[in-house]
Amino acid sequence: MNIADLRKEIVSSDAKVAFDAIVDGFSGQVGMSMNAHEQGFLNSLRIYRDSDYCFAAVPNDEWVLAYIRKPELRRGKLTVDGVMAAFPEARLTNQGEVTLRIRDAGTAARWLAMIRSAA
């Protein structure tokens, strides 16, 4: 499995553009890396800050489910309250991670800008 395979799982053209924006946005950041991950029926893009698995993007037919994971939240530069204020549609999981359904490139750009500002 590779990143192109993940993109093929998306049906919506807007969500494909959003996925591309996420991949491009993290590709250009120093200290960030990513890889496609396959686990049963749930395939994801794992995004690392140095060696910490801080973010994920899970393709869906109509959106990309973006995760801000606990290792990133523990850094203290992004907070659950801050993310929820910026994205009221975001949700907090039972594991204490923040998820957001990203359906378009504009939302992807806002999400990436928030992450970059917390670098």
Specify the residue positions occupied by each region the protein language model found.
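Generic structural signal for short, solvent-exposed loop/turn connectors between secondary structure elements
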Residues: M1, D14, P59-E62, A119
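Well-ordered alpha/beta subsegment
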Residues: E89-A119
